[in-house]
Amino acid sequence: MPDKFAALRKKYLSSFPAKLEGVEDAWEKHDMKLLHDLVHKLAGSSGGYGFDEISRQCKNILSQLHESKNTTTNDIERAINQLMQLLSSAQ
C-alpha cells in the first residue's frame, strides 16, 4: 500500500508546475474568484497528499482573501509568493 500512495503522491507532485502557473496567472489578472477556487482546491488536495505546509499556506491565503478589507494587497501578494516558492521546491 505505501508504494501505491508514493506513486500517487509523485503523480500529484508532477502537477505542481501547472498549479503554480494557474495561481500566478489568476493573481496577475486580478481574477480573485479563479484565484480563490484554485487555492481552495489546492488547500484540500495538498493536505491529502501530505503536503501540509502547502495546505496551511493555501488556508492562510484563503483567510486573507475572505478578509480582504483588513488585508493589504501586499500581504496577499507576499502569501502567494510564499505559496509559489513552496510549490516550486516541493519534493
Residue spans for each PLM region:
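Solenoid-repeat scaffolds in large eukaryotic assemblies
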Residues: 34-35, 54-55
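Amphipathic, coiled-coil-like alpha-helical segments
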Residues: 2-21, 45-53, 60, 68-91
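A short hydrophobic/aromatic micro-motif that marks alpha-helical segments and, especially, helix-coil
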Residues: 34, 65-66
